[in-house]
Amino acid sequence: MQNLVISDMPTLLIKEILDDDEQLKIVAARSYEHVNYFDKIVLIDNQDVKGFRLTLHAWNCNYYNKEIPNEELIHNHRFSFWSHIYRGTLFSENFIEAQSPSVEKKVFNKYIYRPSATGNIHTCEFDKKAQLIKVENMCVKQGEIYYLNFETTHRVILPENGSNLCTFVLRGPREREYTNTYNTFYPERRIESSVPMMKPSQLKSKLLKILGEKI
């Protein structure tokens, strides 16, 4: 990851995609607005579960001119990853699951989250009630890199409206077939979610915004 950052690979890849209409279509067809309120742009894909993948995660906290609710968005991952802060500053929190219940702790619904191969469709199966303990606050500034193990439960603090946050993510091999998510607003049953893939024009607008250029 360090070598990719030194060579400014995020900027080079974005400009290469913007300069090639066919690549713009290909990348748009595998990118989408994630349910956790960020744009997931898959720059370089890899269908091998033991392979690596490069993505951009760009937070836009005013989708459709609606206020984003105060949702927990706490989760872990199927894979470990390295993340370079390309724009802005990332604030996040890490948690562990409490082993003993306490009346002083918030109670969450814990779900088993299974995404589709394309990622834009997923199911959540209710697992159990759980309580969490926050163990770390993280602040990672523009230009810095951090590593997150797939078993780490965390959440990214959504940036304030108008603030830029974009990360360049190198995803490692898949470690398991599911993740866990914790919240208080999903029902205690199975739910499904589906969001559309991006259109080329939509992706172009988002990439130009990330670069800080006028559309």
Regions found by a protein language model. Name each.
Residues 96-150:
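Short acidic-glycine-tyrosine-enriched beta hairpin
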Residues 27-30, 68-75, 135, 155-157:
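Catalytic micro-motifs at enzyme active sites that drive phosphoryl/nucleotidyl and oxygen chemistry
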Residues 162-178:
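A short hydrophobic beta-strand segment most commonly corresponding to one strand
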Residues 176-215:
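Long, compositionally biased interface segments
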Residues 92-93, 154-160:
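Short beta-strand His + acidic residue motifs that chelate non-heme Fe in jelly-roll/DSBH
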Residues 77-92, 96, 170:
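Short, conserved beta-strand element in jelly-roll/cupin
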Residues 56-76, 93-94, 98-99, 150:
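Conserved short histidine dyad/triad with adjacent acidic residue
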Residues 1-58:
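A short, N-terminal "cap"/entry segment at the start of jelly-roll beta-barrel domains
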